[in-house]
């Protein structure tokens, strides 16, 4: 018999029902569960797939450059970044009538186009790209890298080039390589690009390969470096009247510590950014020489971890046994990587708007809103994934004998205390925050707004003041003009920083009040509840009082049959599944808060947020309802406009979201009966019954239906908000 899908599981391949297809797709990437898998093949498969992943990323970024060069308006945007709308790509749609063609022909284009809200124009402009030819060159280079990655992935699957398991488990060499080789060298290379190409570009000097060796980025070249006069590189920075991309008001400094923002572009000084990357490069190049490899010097990871025992002896054996536990568990390593990456992605969302690095991006409001929302949602998914793989580690890889009384074992021993603390924190935050909101709602409804309970966030205001914000009247640290902290930084970065913190036209340290206090605690509720569900799922993954043998059932099981009541819904996968809903809910509150506060800031009516955000009706009426008017107006009696695509996507997003409930609420029996009815009708319908199937159609399993429901819920939820966000922001600010 010919091999049927899935080849990696002969047991599944012989399943006579459609379960074969869905289970095959579901377990395609779970290499550990495949037939004849060895540890060596497992590591090699994952290693090769990383190259495939890189190839896809390079292809995607190449596509961005290529389409903007081919169909965009980069060169005209460069001439006037604040008034020309950047084009992502053309739209070819046979359904477009004349009104649609007119509505979507924008940004100086000849036909219908999509506007770019990704910030790539600002990014490319900042790093020194100026012409379509530059973009094509970049696209071709990335295409070349993509091909190289594919070849490398294929190569490392060939017998002669397959790395051994010992190579994959050489933690010190990998750390040194990643720290020095990837972070250190790439940061140094990026500093080089900024100094040699981007900074001259910002001063009207066009540097390419043909004049790369002729243009000195600094008049004295490397002289100050070798004579120890490094401070010369910071002298004569760009002036506050500098026009970006021209020599007007330009200086000669390349590595500065000015602080604050370039007055015209409203972004960080490019010379500050170069200095930052040089410092990072230095730190990581040093860090990558700390671990012992072939030369017998430096730290051994195992020794470091074994030495980490708490003093006094009352807190167990610390990190003993962790080295082998982590080094032999791919899920533990992935969990750590995802946890770190998730936090970093959320920090990127925060810093991209508060400390914008790209020229003119701060004045492109829709792009700012889109990038913040995009990175926060991605951070949410990555962080929940960290806990999922933590739970899989506990089920598949955790060895109690190896970890006796160390931090992992003690986490499991104290899980009741950990869960109950998270529980009371969530209950406290939930009831108090909702109580305050609802009280304020009732006061507004009864016409006595002065009876609201409004709490000033004085601790947060004090922290902002300590960083130099003077409007609250706290005379402390950097907001006090006669303190040592103020005097120490006065001659370098401080004036620029203080100017930025106290200027109300940017997003650095926004003024906060009672509305912020409430929504901050609502978000804290969401974060703690999500964490509670995820932590409980991981800590109970091996077993609980209710089901002590849970680990024998694997990561995702629906129930243990009718014989053991109450075993449904308690697999580690179920915890992940429930947590994703809470995660989406939380990121929803985060993005609503960010967007509403910024809309009022950009429109100059901050009082609307301050007055309406203290009660729930204010959020529903003055944020959601008021700002969805543009969406509902995409089609009107006068025809259509450029928001109609978002209006359609808003409706379509709701449809996808609602479809999720169809899978989440009804279970297998209903679908099985429906499928059998459909199969009966199919077999009795002329022409249709010429099409036969080999697999008996069966309903999705409980776990699969939940996954499909969750996927629709998540995609619909994000689609709906994306359309709302982009339409309401671009509708107001063009």
Curated annotation (Swiss-Prot):
Identify a single GO molecular function assigned to this protein.
4 iron, 4 sulfur cluster binding
Cell location = Plastid, Chloroplast thylakoid membrane
Kindly report, in one word, the top-level EC class recorded for this enzyme: oxidoreductase
Please tell me where chlorophyll a B1 binds in this chain: 654
**Transmembrane parts of this sequence:** 46-69, 135-158, 175-199, 273-291, 330-353, 369-395, 417-439, 517-535, 575-596, 643-665, 707-727
Protein EC: 1.97.1.12
In this chain, phylloquinone is annotated as bound at: 671
Q: Is Metal-binding one of the keywords UniProt gives this record?
A: yes
Q: Which UniProt keywords apply?
A: 4Fe-4S, Chlorophyll, Chloroplast, Chromophore, Electron transport, Iron, Iron-sulfur, Magnesium, Membrane, Metal-binding, Oxidoreductase, Photosynthesis, Photosystem I, Plastid, Thylakoid, Transmembrane, Transmembrane helix, Transport
Pfam families registered for this protein in UniProt: PsaA_PsaB
Report residues binding [4Fe-4S] cluster.
Answer: 559, 568
For the keyword Membrane, the answer is yes
**List of residues binding chlorophyll a B3:** 662, 670
Report the sequence similarity comment from the record.
Answer: Belongs to the PsaA/PsaB family.
| Subunit composition and interactions | The PsaA/B heterodimer binds the P700 chlorophyll special pair and subsequent electron acceptors. PSI consists of a core antenna complex that captures photons, and an electron transfer chain that converts photonic excitation into a charge separation. The eukaryotic PSI reaction center is composed of at least 11 subunits.
Specify the protein name: Photosystem I P700 chlorophyll a apoprotein A2
Q: What gene name is given for the protein in this entry? A: psaB
């Amino acid at each position: 018999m010919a091999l049927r899908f899935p080849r990696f599981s002969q047991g599944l391949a012989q399943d006579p029902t459609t379960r074969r297809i869905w289970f095959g797709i579901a377990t395609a990437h779970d290499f550990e569960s495949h037939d004849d898998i060895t540890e060596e093949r497992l590591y090699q498969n994952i290693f090769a797939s990383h190259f495939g992943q890189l190839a896809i990323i390079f292809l995607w970024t190449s596509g961005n450059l290529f389409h903007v060069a081919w169909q965009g308006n980069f060169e005209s945007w460069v001439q006037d970044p604040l008034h020309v709308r950047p084009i992502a790509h053309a739209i070819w749609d046979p359904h477009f009538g004349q009104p649609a063609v007119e509505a979507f022909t924008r940004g100086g284009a000849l036909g219908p186009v999509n506007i770019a809200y990704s910030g790539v124009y600002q990014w490319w402009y900042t790093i020194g790209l100026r012409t379509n030819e530059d973009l094509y060159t970049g696209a071709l280079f990335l295409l070349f890298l993509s091909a190289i990655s594919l070849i490398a992935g294929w190569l490392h699957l060939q017998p002669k080039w397959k790395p051994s398991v010992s190579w994959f488990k050489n933690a010190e060499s990998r750390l040194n390589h990643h720290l020095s080789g990837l972070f250190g060298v790439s940061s140094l290379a990026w500093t080089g690009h900024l100094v040699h190409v981007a900074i001259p570009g910002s001063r009207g000097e066009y540097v390419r390969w043909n004049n790369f060796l002729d243009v000195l980025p600094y008049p004295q070249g490397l002289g100050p470096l070798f004579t120890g006069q490094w401070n010369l590189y910071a002298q004569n920075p760009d002036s506050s009247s500098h026009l970006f991309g021209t020599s007007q008001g330009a200086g000669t400094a390349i590595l500065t510590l000015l602080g604050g923002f370039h007055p015209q572009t409203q972004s960080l000084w490019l010379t500050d950014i170069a200095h930052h990357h040089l410092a990072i490069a230095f730190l990581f190049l040093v860090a990558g020489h700390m671990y012992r490899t072939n030369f017998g010097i430096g730290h051994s990871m195992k020794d470091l971890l074994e030495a980490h025992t708490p003093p006094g002896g009352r807190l167990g054996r610390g990190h003993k046994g962790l080295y082998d536990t982590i080094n032999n568990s791919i899920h533990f390593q992935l969990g750590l990587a995802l946890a770190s990456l998730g936090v970093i992605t959320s920090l990127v969302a925060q810093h991209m708007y508060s400390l914008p690095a790209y020229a003119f991006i701060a004045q492109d409001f829709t792009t700012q809103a889109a990038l913040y929302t995009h990175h926060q949602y991605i951070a949410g998914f990555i962080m929940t994934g960290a806990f999922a793989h933590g739970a899989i580690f506990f089920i598949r890889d955790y060895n109690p004998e190896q970890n006796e009384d160390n931090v992992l074992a003690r986490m499991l021993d104290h899980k009741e205390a950990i869960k109950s603390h998270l529980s009371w924190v969530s209950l406290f935050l939930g009831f108090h925050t909702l109580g305050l909101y609802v009280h304020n709602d009732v006061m507004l409804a009864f016409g006595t707004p002065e009876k609201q309970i409004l709490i000033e966030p004085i601790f947060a205001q004090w922290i902002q003041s300590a960083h130099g914000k003077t409007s609250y009247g706290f005379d402390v640290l950097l907001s006090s003009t006669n303190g040592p902290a103020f005097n120490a930084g006065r001659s370098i970065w401080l004036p620029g920083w203080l100017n930025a913190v106290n200027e109300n036209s940017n997003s650095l340290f926004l003024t906060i009040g009672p509305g912020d206090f409430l929504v901050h605690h609502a978000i804290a509720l969401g974060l703690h509840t999500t964490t509670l569900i995820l932590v409980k799922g991981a800590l109970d993954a091996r077993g609980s009082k209710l089901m002590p043998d849970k680990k024998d059932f694997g990561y995702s099981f629906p129930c243990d049959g009718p014989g053991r009541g109450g075993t449904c819904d308690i697999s580690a996968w179920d915890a992940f599944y429930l947590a994703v809903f809470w995660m989406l809910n939380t990121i929803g509150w985060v993005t609503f808060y960010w967007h509403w506060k910024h809309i009022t800031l950009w429109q100059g009516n901050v009082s609307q947020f301050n007055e309406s955000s203290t009660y729930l009706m204010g959020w529903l009426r003055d944020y959601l309802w008021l700002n969805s008017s543009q969406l509902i107006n995409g089609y009107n009696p006068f025809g259509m406009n450029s928001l109609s695509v978002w209006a359609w996507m808003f409706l379509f997003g709701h449809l996808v979201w609602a479809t999720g409930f169809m899978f989440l609420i009804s279970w297998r029996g209903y679908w099985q009966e429906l499928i059998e009815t459909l199969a009966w009708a199919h077999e009795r319908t002329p022409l249709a019954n010429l099409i036969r199937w080999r697999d008996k159609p069966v309903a999705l399993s409980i776990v699969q239906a939940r996954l499909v429901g969750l996927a629709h819920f998540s995609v619909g939820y994000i689609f709906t908000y994306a359309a709302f966000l982009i339409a309401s922001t671009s509708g107001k600010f063009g």
